[in-house]
C-alpha cells in the first residue's frame, strides 16, 4: 500500500496568509495523509508570537490525528537578536515546534529522517556536519531494503536551476560530502524547501555519481513572499514502492487548494523516468 505524504515547506508565520493557512488544513482534512512533513521556516523572524502561531497550527494538525515530522529552517534562527542567534539559535524552535532536531518516522512502507541544516553563522544558507552525515548512514542502514528511504532537510543538498532567471541555486554547505553520504545510505527521495520553488529531478542529473535519489523541492505553502510568479503550493506524494514515486503539486487558486502538475517517477535501475499522469474526467 502506498504511503501518502503531504510535504509542506516555508510556511513563514509572520508573513503568512491566514486564508491560505486555513486552506492547507481543509485540504489535509479531506485527503488524510499518512504523514505531514514540514521542511523548515516555520516563522518569518523567529519571534515568540510567530512561533506561537506556528505551534498552534501544528497542534491543530496533531489534534486532527496527523503525524507530523518537522525540521527547522534558517528563518527559525533569530536574525537581528545577535546574542540569541549565537547563544541559543534554536531555543524557541525547540520550545514551540520540536525538541528533536533529527526526527525519525517509520512505518510498514517508508522510513523518514529529518536533518537540521539551519546554522547561526550562515544567515540564509545552511550547513550539514559530519556527525549528521554519519547519522544518515547509520539510521538508514537498519531499514528494510523494501522500504522507501526519505531524507528531509530545509536547505537542498543539490544545486538546482531554480534561482533567479533559473540559474543554479546554492546547495547546502558541505554538499559534496553530504551527497556521498546520501548515496551510501541508499536514500531514495530527498525532500527540501528554502527557495519557494517547486522542482523534481533525479539527483544524478545534477551531480555526477549522486546515486539513485529523486530530489523533490517544495514551494512555500502559506507565505506571501512568492518567487518567480509561483503561487503557494505543497507536494502530495504517494510512495508506492521505493522505485515508484507519484508526485502531485497542490496549488492555491485564490479560494482553495487544487491539484496541479502530476507526474509518476519510476526508477529503472539507472535513472528516474517521469511519466505525466492524465486525470480522468
Predicted regions located by residue number:
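Active-site environment of divalent metal-dependent phosphoester hydrolases
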Residues: 14-19, 44-47, 71-82, 120-124, ...
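Beta-strand-turn-beta hairpins that frame and shape the catalytic cleft
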Residues: 1-6, 103-114, 144-148, 209-214
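Mobile, glycine- and charge-enriched loop segments
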Residues: 1-18, 128, 132-172, 265-281
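Extended active-site neighborhood of metal-dependent phosphoesterases/phosphodiesterases
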Residues: 53-138, 143, 181, 236
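A short C-terminal boundary segment appended to hydrolase-like catalytic domains
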Residues: 238-281
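Conserved beta-sheet core of the metallophosphoesterase superfamily
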Residues: 166-242
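N-terminal active-site segment of His-dependent metallophosphoesterases
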Residues: 1-60, 80, 101
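Active-site neighborhood of phospho(di)ester-bond hydrolases with catalytic His/Asp-centered motifs
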Residues: 8-9, 36-41, 67-74, 116, ...
Amino acid at each position: 500500500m502506498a504511503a501518502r505524504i503531504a510535504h509542506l515547506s516555508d510556511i513563514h508565520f509572520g508573513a503568512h496568509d491566514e486564508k491560505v493557512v486555513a486552506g492547507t488544513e481543509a485540504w489535509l482534512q479531506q485527503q488524510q495523509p499518512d504523514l505531514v512533513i514540514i521542511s523548515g521556516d516555520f516563522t518569518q523572524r523567529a519571534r515568540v508570537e510567530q512561533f506561537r502561531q506556528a505551534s498552534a497550527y501544528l497542534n491543530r494538525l496533531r489534534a486532527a490525528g496527523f503525524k507530523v515530522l518537522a525540521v527547522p529552517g534558517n528563518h527559525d534562527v533569530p536574525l537581528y537578536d545577535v546574542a540569541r542567534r549565537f547563544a541559543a539559535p534554536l531555543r524557541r524552535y525547540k520550545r514551540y515546534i520540536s525538541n528533536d532536531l533529527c526526527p525519525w518516522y517509520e512505518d510498514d512502507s517508508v522510513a523518514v529522517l529529518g536533518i537540521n541544516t539551519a546554522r547561526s553563522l550562515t544567515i540564509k544558507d545552511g550547513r550539514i556536519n559530519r556527525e549528521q552525515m554519519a547519522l544518515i548512514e547509520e539510521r538508514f542502514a537498519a531499514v528494510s531494503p523494501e522500504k522507501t528511504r526519505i531524507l528531509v532537510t530545509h536547505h537542498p543538498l543539490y544545486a538546482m536551476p531554480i534561482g533567479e532567471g533559473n540559474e543554479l541555486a546554492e546547495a547546502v554547505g558541505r554538499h559534496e560530502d553530504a551527497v556521498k553520504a546520501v548515496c551510501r545510505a541508499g536514500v531514495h527521495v530527498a525532500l527540501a524547501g528554502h527557495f519557494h520553488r517547486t522542482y523534481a529531478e533525479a539527483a544524478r542529473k545534477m551531480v555526477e555519481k549522486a546515486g539513485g535519489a529523486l530530489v523533490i523541492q517544495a514551494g512555500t505553502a502559506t507565505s506571501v513572499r512568492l518567487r518567480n510568479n509561483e503561487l503557494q503550493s505543497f507536494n502530495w506524494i504517494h510512495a508506492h514502492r521505493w522505485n515508484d514515486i507519484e508526485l502531485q503539486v497542490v496549488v492555491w487558486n485564490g479560494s482553495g487548494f487544487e491539484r496541479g502538475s502530476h507526474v509518476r517517477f519510476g526508477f529503472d535501475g539507472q535513472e528516474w523516468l517521469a511519466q505525466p499522469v492524465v486525470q480522468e474526467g
